[in-house]
């Protein structure tokens, strides 16, 4: 609800450098949850310094996808360009009517059964399959991903106040992290800390902070919370964490390829 619209707006703005204004019409899920997801805020920021009128269309008109938006470029009050865009999740967009770009053939296998059989035949683990397909540079990338995840947890645990979005929801991560009870069981403590980490990242997302789409902004708190807890309390090394991220990426890629990572869809 933010990365996709931002990408679409930036692309459309670059294509219409002479336009003196824009209209962004949001439909479906984008319209109904736009302010809470800061969709309107990111569109205004992206189109700046030129003005943009944000329209929320709550009608039940047929749509090609629940996350549909229309962009109009104006010059002297007249329409000079128009585009309908679909935000399919994880920052990916599809322009209505265009043939989707064919992604690079990084992973030749598209089902887990195929990957499992391949790994068994070649006696490799999932992270080794990723390394084979992506190359050694994947570890530098995943290192940055892990650093960003930990930073998001740290910021979230150190911040109080009201979240953006207009619903006056208070941040809970810091309170939950410090709310230790004298008679707290080991299981309760574990649940409290994991939840606090997850809240911390999700609240950073709700405030427009820097997080990792895993695989989307809405799901951004789960992996950081579990992985950080396992590292801090169970002694998992950075290398093991990065390998876990690589394996998780395989699963996420299979879902994105064969189904959808869009909650609205």
What residue spans do the PLM features occupy?
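N-terminal phosphate-binding or glycine-rich loops at protein starts, especially the Walker A/P-loop
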Residues: 2-25
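Catalytic-loop motifs flanking and including active-site residues across diverse enzymes
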Residues: 4-8, 39, 219-223
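A glycine- and small-aliphatic-rich helix-loop capping segment at beta-alpha/alpha-beta transitions
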Residues: 11-15, 39-46, 228-236
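Short coil/turn connectors at secondary-structure junctions
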Residues: 17-22, 48-52, 66-68, 79-81, ...
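A structural-propensity feature for long, helix-poor, extended segments
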Residues: 21-56, 243-265
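C-terminal regulatory domains involved in ligand/effector binding and gene-expression control
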Residues: 46-184, 192
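Accessory "access/gating" subregions that flank catalytic or transport cores
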Residues: 140, 150-264
């Amino acid at each position: 609800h933010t990365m996709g619209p931002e990408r679409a707006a930036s692309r459309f703005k670059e294509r219409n450098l002479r336009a003196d204004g824009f209209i962004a019409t949001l439909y479906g899920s984008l319209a109904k949850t736009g302010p809470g997801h800061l969709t309107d805020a990111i569109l205004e920021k992206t189109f700046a310094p030129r003005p943009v009128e944000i329209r929320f269309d709550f009608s039940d008109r047929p749509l090609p996808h629940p996350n549909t938006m229309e962009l109009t470029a104006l010059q002297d009050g007249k329409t000079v360009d128009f585009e309908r865009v679909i935000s399919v999740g994880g920052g990916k967009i599809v322009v209505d009517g265009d043939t989707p770009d064919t992604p690079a053939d990084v992973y030749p296998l598209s089902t887990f059964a195929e990957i499992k059989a391949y790994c068994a035949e070649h006696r490799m683990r999932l992270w080794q399959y990723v390394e084979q397909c992506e190359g050694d540079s994947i570890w530098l990338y995943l290192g940055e991903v892990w650093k960003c995840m930990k930073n998001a947890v740290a910021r979230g645990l150190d911040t109080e106040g009201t979240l953006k979005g207009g619903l006056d929801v208070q941040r809970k991560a810091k309170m939950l992290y410090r709310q230790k009870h004298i008679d707290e069981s080991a299981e309760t403590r574990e649940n409290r800390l994991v939840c606090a980490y997850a809240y911390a990242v999700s609240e950073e997302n709700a405030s427009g902070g820097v997080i990792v789409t895993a695989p989307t902004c809405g799901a951004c708190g789960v992996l950081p919370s579990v992985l950080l807890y396992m590292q801090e309390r169970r002694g998992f090394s950075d290398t093991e964490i990065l390998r876990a991220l690589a394996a998780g990426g395989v699963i996420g890629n299979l879902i994105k390829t064969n189904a959808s990572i869009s909650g609205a869809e």
